Amino acid sequence: MAALLCAGTVSAKTLVFCSEGSPENFYPGINTTGTSFDANSQIYSRIVDFERGGTTVVPGLAERWDISPDGKVYTFHLRKGVKWHNHRDWKPTRDFNADDMIFAIERQWKESNPYFKVTSSNHSYFMDMGMPKLIKSVERVDDYTVRVTLEKPEAP
């Protein structure tokens, strides 16, 4: 009984993640391995996600999105009230918003972005998906709406 009570206390403070290998990093922008993608999927939320066990696109940080008739303009309507995580060394002062989505895209897309090389200039997944040539523009419509315009219709 005492061992069971102690185990409960430890598990409340310890995260155990079973994986086939060690993640190479915990920044999804430079992931190249399945182990890193698997580990990061438990930490980070995405704009859209896949239905569990399938390929149907479902809401994530975007509660909904519109696609233009020509398939080139995606307008993402972001969820309100999404909080950043808390840590003793960093206290977020605002909710997630359109600026964060734009930052996440531009730090991988634009070499002129001051954060392009902070973690690595090798944003291989983003590059391998052809995103730099596919994205024409990313615009903030309002605090919770982002418009992404593509050079051609495509759903990578």
Question: What label would you give each PLM region?
Answer:
Residues 6-12:
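Sec/Tat signal peptide C-region and signal peptidase I cleavage site
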Residues 12-14, 21, 42-44, 60-62, ...:
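Extracytoplasmic
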Residues 18-70, 106, 113:
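N-terminal lobe/hinge region of extracytoplasmic solute-binding protein
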Residues 20-23, 31, 52-53, 70-72, ...:
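Solvent-exposed coil/turn segments that connect beta secondary-structure elements
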Residues 29-34, 82-92, 134-137:
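Second-shell loop/turn segments in exported
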Residues 42, 56, 60, 96, ...:
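Extracytoplasmic/secreted proteins, especially bacterial periplasmic and envelope-associated proteins
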Residues 63-114, 147:
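Aromatic- and charge-enriched surface segment that lines or borders ligand/interaction sites
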Residues 109-156:
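Surface-exposed binding/hinge segments that line
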